[in-house]
């Protein structure tokens, strides 16, 4: 048995081995050929000592950057006290985080879980319970947008309006229908058709800005009317704020960008600053869960909640919301300048705050993943949001000088494709 284990171990890669060496990790990601070992602020280092400017931040997750002093201190203290207990008992760190969230949002109560997909699963269950209890619907329908992304679990991916994510996993969970994002006429026609014979729609689940779907910002006029229609029909309006929430868009919450309030919204990513936590936040009238309706073993554990509360208070203490607005404007201005200087390659810029997308020309012969790959040569980390959008989601602490470096390295990357 020992020889067999040694044989297995020798077949797999290790730190310092070739980045393309086989590993025991399942191949669910098409990984870049880079092994990252440490980080500080907006910078990360690989196993060869190369330094990269990180405009990915764990995909909009490391709000305070890497190895943040306040996070290290608070989490070190928490590990000395209590790391995990069951939700069968009261958890002070969980209650403190919930209090902060409801004091600083439109919500009245919070359910904690471990990820964005889990938060959206909870939202889907909440929507169905609302449909059954409040609207008397036997088979509730949830409306979501084309090009949306709500997670990789089965119900969340069924809610995702991108058929390529469905392939190979059929049958999808029933009860989802899709409409064109920001298209009010199409939405109203679909809603009227579905409601013509009586109540059938329980909720609308929608991103204020579509991240994975191409960095598509919501239009305020569309969302205002969406809010009116949902209220008129007693339909829950649920925002997926997994990527835009916790200050990334230049406000605490994406709904503030649009001037309306949802009945519920979901969070994850930046909430934990790099630690696994998700949340469903609801207004009082949408708080329908009862004991036994939903649960999470690890959701809201003391360690994760301590991390999230530290992130929230550090964003406040450092005035990062205003800085995100300033740095976002600086980044957008620089990206707009690149569009003007690379007209054959680039089409435009879109996004909010420090969630910006550089849109490639439709006829360009290269893709956003090609750009992300080439950026590694310039020691820059960026990611794709679909085939034609290069996405930048740096830590919220990024400095003006680092924005300038990001733009310089991105320009050098684009020169590969002239």
Curated annotation (Swiss-Prot):
It is found in: Cytoplasm. Pathway: Amino-acid biosynthesis; L-arginine biosynthesis; N(2)-acetyl-L-ornithine from L-glutamate: step 4/4. Binds 1 pyridoxal phosphate per subunit. CDD domains: OAT_like. SUPFAM superfamilies: PLP-dependent transferases. Keywords: Amino-acid biosynthesis, Aminotransferase, Arginine biosynthesis, Cytoplasm, Pyridoxal phosphate, Transferase. It is an enzyme of class 2 (transferase). Its cofactor is pyridoxal 5'-phosphate. It catalyses: N(2)-acetyl-L-ornithine + 2-oxoglutarate = N-acetyl-L-glutamate 5-semialdehyde + L-glutamate. It comes from the Bacteria. It holds the Pfam family Aminotran_3. The modification N6-(pyridoxal phosphate)lysine is found at residue 269. Pyridoxal 5'-phosphate binds at residues 116-117, 149, 240-243, 297. Its EC number is 2.6.1.11. GO terms for molecular function: identical protein binding; N2-acetyl-L-ornithine:2-oxoglutarate 5-aminotransferase activity; pyridoxal phosphate binding. One of its GO terms (cellular component) is cytoplasm. HAMAP family: ArgD_aminotrans_3. May also have succinyldiaminopimelate aminotransferase activity, thus carrying out the corresponding step in lysine biosynthesis. Belongs to the class-III pyridoxal-phosphate-dependent aminotransferase family. ArgD subfamily. This is Acetylornithine aminotransferase. The gene is argD.
């Amino acid at each position: 048995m020992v020889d067999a284990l040694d044989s297995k171990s020798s077949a797999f890669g290790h730190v310092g081995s070739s980045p393309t060496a086989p590993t025991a990790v399942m191949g669910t990601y098409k990984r870049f050929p880079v092994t990252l070992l440490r980080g500080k602020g907006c910078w990360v280092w690989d196993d060869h000592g190369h330094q990269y400017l990180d405009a990915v931040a764990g995909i909009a997750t490391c709000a305070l950057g890497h190895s943040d002093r306040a996070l290290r201190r608070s989490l070190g203290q928490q590990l000395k006290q209590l790391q995990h207990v069951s939700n069968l008992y009261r958890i002070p760190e969980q209650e403190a985080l919930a209090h902060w969230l409801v004091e600083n949002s439109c919500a009245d109560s919070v359910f904690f879980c471990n990820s964005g997909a889990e938060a959206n699963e909870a939202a889907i269950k909440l929507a169905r319970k609302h449909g059954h209890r409040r609207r008397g619907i036997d088979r509730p329908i949830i409306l979501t947008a084309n090009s949306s992304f709500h997670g990789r679990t089965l119900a969340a991916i069924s809610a995702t309006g991108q058929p390529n994510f469905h392939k190979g996993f059929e049958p999808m969970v029933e009860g989802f229908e899709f409409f064109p994002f920001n298209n009010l006429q199409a939405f109203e026609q679909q809603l009227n058709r579905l409601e013509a014979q009586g109540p059938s729609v329980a909720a609308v689940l929608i991103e204020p800005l579509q991240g994975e779907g191409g960095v598509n910002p919501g239009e305020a006029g569309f969302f205002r009317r969406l809010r009116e229609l949902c209220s008129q029909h007693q339909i829950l309006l649920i925002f997926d704020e997994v990527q835009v929430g916790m200050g990334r868009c230049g406000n605490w919450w994406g709904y503030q960008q649009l001037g309306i309030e949802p009945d519920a919204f979901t969070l994850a990513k930046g909430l934990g600053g790099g630690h696994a936590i998700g949340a469903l936040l609801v207004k009082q009238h949408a708080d329908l869960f009862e004991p036994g309706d939903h649960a999470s073993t690890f959701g809201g554990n003391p360690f994760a909640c301590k991390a999230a509360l530290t992130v929230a208070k550090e964003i406040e203490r450092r005035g990062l919301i205003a800085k995100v607005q300033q740095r976002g404007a600086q980044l957008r201005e620089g990206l707009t300048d690149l569009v003007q200087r690379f007209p054959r390659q680039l089409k435009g810029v879109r996004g909010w705050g420090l969630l910006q997308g550089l849109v490639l020309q439709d006829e360009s012969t290269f893709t956003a993943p090609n750009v992300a790959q080439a950026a590694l040569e310039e020691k820059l980390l960026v990611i794709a949001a679909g085939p034609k959008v290069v996405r930048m989601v740096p830590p919220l602490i990024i400095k003006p000088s680092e924005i300038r470096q990001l733009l310089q390295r991105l320009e050098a990357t684009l020169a590969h494709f002239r």
